[in-house]
Protein backbone atom coordinates (compact mmCIF):
# COMPACT_ATOMS: atom_id res chain seq x y z
CA UNK A 1 0.00 0.00 0.00
CA UNK A 2 2.71 2.41 0.98
CA UNK A 3 4.61 1.57 -2.18
CA UNK A 4 1.56 2.28 -4.38
CA UNK A 5 0.99 5.57 -2.60
CA UNK A 6 4.59 6.62 -3.21
CA UNK A 7 4.27 5.75 -6.88
CA UNK A 8 1.10 7.88 -7.18
CA UNK A 9 2.86 10.81 -5.48
CA UNK A 10 5.81 10.51 -7.85
CA UNK A 11 3.45 10.47 -10.84
CA UNK A 12 1.62 13.57 -9.56
CA UNK A 13 4.93 15.32 -8.95
CA UNK A 14 6.12 14.49 -12.45
CA UNK A 15 2.87 15.74 -14.01
CA UNK A 16 3.05 18.96 -11.95
CA UNK A 17 6.61 19.60 -13.10
CA UNK A 18 5.64 19.04 -16.74
CA UNK A 19 2.66 21.41 -16.43
CA UNK A 20 4.84 24.05 -14.79
CA UNK A 21 7.49 23.74 -17.50
CA UNK A 22 4.81 24.03 -20.18
CA UNK A 23 3.34 27.16 -18.59
CA UNK A 24 6.78 28.74 -18.27
CA UNK A 25 7.50 27.96 -21.91
CA UNK A 26 4.22 29.48 -23.05
CA UNK A 27 4.78 32.56 -20.90
CA UNK A 28 8.34 33.07 -22.13
CA UNK A 29 7.43 32.46 -25.74
CA UNK A 30 4.50 34.87 -25.57
CA UNK A 31 6.48 37.67 -23.93
CA UNK A 32 9.37 37.32 -26.38
CA UNK A 33 7.16 37.52 -29.47
CA UNK A 34 4.58 40.07 -28.36
CA UNK A 35 6.99 43.00 -27.96
CA UNK A 36 8.68 44.46 -31.03
CA UNK A 37 12.13 45.52 -29.81
CA UNK A 38 12.59 47.69 -32.93
CA UNK A 39 9.31 49.59 -32.51
CA UNK A 40 10.87 52.95 -31.62
CA UNK A 41 14.07 52.64 -33.65
CA UNK A 42 14.99 53.83 -37.15
CA UNK A 43 16.66 51.64 -39.74
CA UNK A 44 19.80 53.77 -40.01
CA UNK A 45 20.66 56.49 -37.49
CA UNK A 46 23.35 57.95 -39.76
CA UNK A 47 20.60 59.28 -42.02
CA UNK A 48 19.00 61.33 -39.24
CA UNK A 49 19.77 65.01 -39.78
CA UNK A 50 17.18 66.62 -37.50
CA UNK A 51 15.69 65.76 -34.13
CA UNK A 52 12.78 67.79 -32.75
CA UNK A 53 11.78 67.48 -29.09
CA UNK A 54 8.44 69.18 -28.40
CA UNK A 55 7.27 69.65 -24.81
CA UNK A 56 3.58 70.23 -24.18
CA UNK A 57 4.47 73.61 -22.68
CA UNK A 58 7.62 75.58 -23.35
CA UNK A 59 10.25 75.99 -26.03
CA UNK A 60 10.83 73.07 -28.40
CA UNK A 61 14.36 71.82 -28.97
CA UNK A 62 15.45 71.42 -32.59
CA UNK A 63 18.78 69.69 -33.16
CA UNK A 64 19.83 70.08 -36.78
CA UNK A 65 22.91 68.75 -38.57
CA UNK A 66 24.32 71.10 -41.21
CA UNK A 67 27.77 72.02 -42.51
CA UNK A 68 29.41 69.22 -40.57
CA UNK A 69 28.04 70.03 -37.12
CA UNK A 70 24.92 69.90 -34.98
CA UNK A 71 23.14 73.12 -34.02
CA UNK A 72 20.55 73.91 -31.33
CA UNK A 73 17.50 75.84 -32.56
CA UNK A 74 19.79 77.33 -35.22
CA UNK A 75 21.31 79.57 -32.51
CA UNK A 76 24.10 77.63 -30.79
CA UNK A 77 26.49 74.85 -31.66
CA UNK A 78 25.38 71.65 -29.95
CA UNK A 79 27.33 69.78 -27.29
CA UNK A 80 28.75 66.84 -29.25
CA UNK A 81 28.83 64.63 -26.17
CA UNK A 82 25.12 65.25 -25.60
CA UNK A 83 24.41 64.39 -29.24
CA UNK A 84 26.25 61.08 -28.76
CA UNK A 85 24.22 60.38 -25.62
CA UNK A 86 20.98 61.14 -27.47
CA UNK A 87 21.68 58.76 -30.33
CA UNK A 88 23.03 56.06 -28.00
CA UNK A 89 19.77 56.36 -26.03
CA UNK A 90 17.67 56.07 -29.19
CA UNK A 91 19.71 53.08 -30.34
CA UNK A 92 19.71 51.09 -27.10
CA UNK A 93 16.26 51.83 -25.68
CA UNK A 94 13.74 49.07 -26.29
CA UNK A 95 10.22 48.31 -25.07
CA UNK A 96 10.13 45.92 -22.12
CA UNK A 97 6.36 45.45 -21.91
CA UNK A 98 3.09 47.15 -22.60
CA UNK A 99 1.67 49.21 -19.77
CA UNK A 100 -1.02 47.20 -17.98
CA UNK A 101 -4.32 47.44 -19.86
CA UNK A 102 -6.13 48.77 -16.79
CA UNK A 103 -3.98 51.93 -16.69
CA UNK A 104 -3.10 52.42 -20.37
CA UNK A 105 -5.53 55.32 -20.82
CA UNK A 106 -4.34 57.20 -17.75
CA UNK A 107 -0.66 56.67 -18.60
CA UNK A 108 -1.26 57.75 -22.19
CA UNK A 109 -2.98 60.94 -21.00
CA UNK A 110 -0.13 61.55 -18.55
CA UNK A 111 2.44 61.21 -21.34
CA UNK A 112 0.60 63.60 -23.64
CA UNK A 113 0.05 66.16 -20.85
CA UNK A 114 3.55 66.13 -19.36
CA UNK A 115 5.82 64.38 -21.87
CA UNK A 116 7.58 65.22 -25.12
CA UNK A 117 6.78 64.49 -28.73
CA UNK A 118 9.88 63.24 -30.57
CA UNK A 119 10.31 63.66 -34.32
CA UNK A 120 13.24 62.19 -36.28
CA UNK A 121 13.94 63.49 -39.78
CA UNK A 122 16.00 62.36 -42.73
CA UNK A 123 16.31 65.66 -44.55
CA UNK A 124 12.76 66.94 -44.65
CA UNK A 125 11.22 63.48 -44.39
CA UNK A 126 9.72 62.49 -41.04
CA UNK A 127 10.91 58.90 -40.47
CA UNK A 128 9.88 58.30 -36.85
CA UNK A 129 7.51 59.98 -34.42
CA UNK A 130 6.62 58.97 -30.87
CA UNK A 131 5.94 60.29 -27.39
CA UNK A 132 8.24 60.07 -24.36
CA UNK A 133 7.18 60.49 -20.75
CA UNK A 134 7.84 59.20 -17.27
CA UNK A 135 6.11 58.53 -13.99
CA UNK A 136 6.04 61.17 -11.26
CA UNK A 137 8.75 59.42 -9.25
CA UNK A 138 11.01 59.41 -12.32
CA UNK A 139 11.69 55.71 -12.00
CA UNK A 140 9.98 54.51 -15.20
CA UNK A 141 10.04 55.82 -18.76
CA UNK A 142 7.23 55.32 -21.26
CA UNK A 143 7.39 55.47 -25.07
CA UNK A 144 4.24 55.57 -27.17
CA UNK A 145 3.62 55.67 -30.91
CA UNK A 146 1.04 58.30 -31.99
CA UNK A 147 -1.70 55.69 -32.49
CA UNK A 148 -0.32 53.00 -30.20
CA UNK A 149 -0.34 52.01 -26.57
CA UNK A 150 2.30 53.11 -24.04
CA UNK A 151 5.24 50.83 -23.32
CA UNK A 152 7.56 50.67 -20.35
CA UNK A 153 11.02 50.94 -21.93
CA UNK A 154 14.50 50.05 -20.80
CA UNK A 155 18.15 50.00 -21.77
CA UNK A 156 19.04 46.36 -21.05
CA UNK A 157 21.46 45.99 -18.18
CA UNK A 158 20.90 49.49 -16.77
CA UNK A 159 18.44 51.08 -14.36
CA UNK A 160 18.03 54.55 -15.82
CA UNK A 161 15.37 57.23 -16.03
CA UNK A 162 15.63 57.38 -19.82
CA UNK A 163 13.16 60.25 -20.23
CA UNK A 164 15.63 62.65 -18.54
CA UNK A 165 17.58 62.95 -21.82
CA UNK A 166 14.49 64.28 -23.57
CA UNK A 167 13.46 66.59 -20.72
CA UNK A 168 16.50 68.88 -21.05
CA UNK A 169 15.78 72.49 -22.08
CA UNK A 170 17.44 73.91 -25.20
CA UNK A 171 20.18 75.67 -23.21
CA UNK A 172 21.40 72.32 -21.84
CA UNK A 173 22.16 71.12 -25.38
CA UNK A 174 24.48 74.06 -26.03
CA UNK A 175 28.19 73.36 -26.55
CA UNK A 176 30.03 73.96 -23.27
CA UNK A 177 33.30 75.13 -24.83
CA UNK A 178 33.74 78.87 -24.17
CA UNK A 179 36.25 79.61 -26.93
CA UNK A 180 34.82 77.35 -29.60
CA UNK A 181 36.90 78.01 -32.68
CA UNK A 182 39.83 76.48 -34.56
CA UNK A 183 42.89 77.37 -32.51
CA UNK A 184 45.08 76.98 -35.59
CA UNK A 185 43.53 80.32 -36.59
CA UNK A 186 44.67 82.03 -33.35
CA UNK A 187 45.99 85.57 -33.81
CA UNK A 188 46.06 87.25 -30.39
CA UNK A 189 44.80 87.21 -26.80
CA UNK A 190 44.27 90.29 -24.66
CA UNK A 191 43.73 90.00 -20.89
CA UNK A 192 42.28 93.08 -19.20
CA UNK A 193 42.19 93.47 -15.40
CA UNK A 194 39.69 96.26 -14.82
CA UNK A 195 40.83 97.14 -11.30
CA UNK A 196 44.53 96.50 -11.85
CA UNK A 197 45.32 97.76 -15.31
CA UNK A 198 49.06 97.38 -14.80
CA UNK A 199 48.46 93.61 -14.92
CA UNK A 200 47.05 93.79 -18.46
CA UNK A 201 48.89 91.84 -21.11
CA UNK A 202 48.55 90.76 -24.73
CA UNK A 203 49.76 87.56 -26.36
CA UNK A 204 50.26 87.47 -30.11
CA UNK A 205 52.14 85.76 -32.87
CA UNK A 206 55.47 87.50 -33.30
CA UNK A 207 57.00 86.36 -36.56
CA UNK A 208 57.65 82.64 -35.90
CA UNK A 209 56.76 82.33 -32.21
CA UNK A 210 54.17 83.35 -29.63
CA UNK A 211 55.14 86.17 -27.31
CA UNK A 212 53.87 88.85 -24.94
CA UNK A 213 53.79 92.34 -26.38
CA UNK A 214 56.53 94.45 -24.79
CA UNK A 215 58.18 91.45 -23.14
CA UNK A 216 60.69 89.88 -25.55
CA UNK A 217 62.04 87.42 -22.95
CA UNK A 218 58.71 85.76 -22.15
CA UNK A 219 58.79 82.01 -21.50
CA UNK A 220 57.30 80.46 -24.65
CA UNK A 221 56.56 77.13 -22.95
CA UNK A 222 54.54 78.85 -20.20
CA UNK A 223 52.67 80.91 -22.79
CA UNK A 224 51.73 77.76 -24.70
CA UNK A 225 50.56 76.11 -21.47
CA UNK A 226 48.47 79.19 -20.66
CA UNK A 227 46.85 79.19 -24.10
CA UNK A 228 46.17 75.46 -23.81
CA UNK A 229 44.44 76.06 -20.46
CA UNK A 230 42.33 78.88 -21.91
CA UNK A 231 41.36 76.75 -24.90
CA UNK A 232 40.01 74.04 -22.57
CA UNK A 233 37.74 76.30 -20.50
CA UNK A 234 34.19 74.94 -20.43
CA UNK A 235 30.97 76.07 -18.81
CA UNK A 236 29.51 73.86 -16.12
CA UNK A 237 26.10 75.08 -17.26
CA UNK A 238 24.60 78.17 -18.86
CA UNK A 239 22.31 80.45 -16.85
CA UNK A 240 19.08 81.51 -18.49
CA UNK A 241 18.40 85.24 -18.39
CA UNK A 242 16.37 86.06 -15.27
CA UNK A 243 17.23 82.77 -13.56
CA UNK A 244 19.47 84.39 -10.92
CA UNK A 245 19.51 87.92 -9.42
CA UNK A 246 22.74 89.16 -11.02
CA UNK A 247 22.01 92.91 -11.22
CA UNK A 248 24.43 93.90 -8.44
CA UNK A 249 27.15 91.68 -9.88
CA UNK A 250 26.73 93.12 -13.36
CA UNK A 251 26.77 96.70 -12.05
CA UNK A 252 30.07 96.05 -10.26
CA UNK A 253 31.65 95.08 -13.56
CA UNK A 254 33.88 92.13 -14.44
CA UNK A 255 37.02 91.36 -12.46
CA UNK A 256 38.85 90.69 -15.70
CA UNK A 257 38.14 89.83 -19.31
CA UNK A 258 39.84 87.83 -22.02
CA UNK A 259 39.46 88.68 -25.68
CA UNK A 260 40.75 86.34 -28.36
CA UNK A 261 41.05 87.38 -31.99
CA UNK A 262 41.46 84.95 -34.88
CA UNK A 263 43.14 85.55 -38.24
CA UNK A 264 39.78 86.61 -39.71
CA UNK A 265 39.61 89.32 -37.00
CA UNK A 266 36.64 87.69 -35.28
CA UNK A 267 36.58 88.41 -31.55
CA UNK A 268 35.67 85.97 -28.75
CA UNK A 269 35.20 87.66 -25.37
CA UNK A 270 34.91 86.15 -21.89
CA UNK A 271 34.11 88.40 -18.92
CA UNK A 272 34.77 86.96 -15.47
CA UNK A 273 32.75 88.15 -12.45
CA UNK A 274 33.73 87.31 -8.89
Kindly give the residue locations of the regions a language model identified.
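Secondary-structure "cap/kink" motif recognition
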Residues: 1-274
Amino acid sequence: MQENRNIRLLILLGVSILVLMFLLYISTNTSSTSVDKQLFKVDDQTNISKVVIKPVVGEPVELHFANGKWRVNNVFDADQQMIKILFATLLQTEPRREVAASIQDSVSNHIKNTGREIQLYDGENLVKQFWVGGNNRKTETYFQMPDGVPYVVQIPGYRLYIASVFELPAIEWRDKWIFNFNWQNFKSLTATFHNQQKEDFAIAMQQTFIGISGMPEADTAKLNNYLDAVSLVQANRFIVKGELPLDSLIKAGPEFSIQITDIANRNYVLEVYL
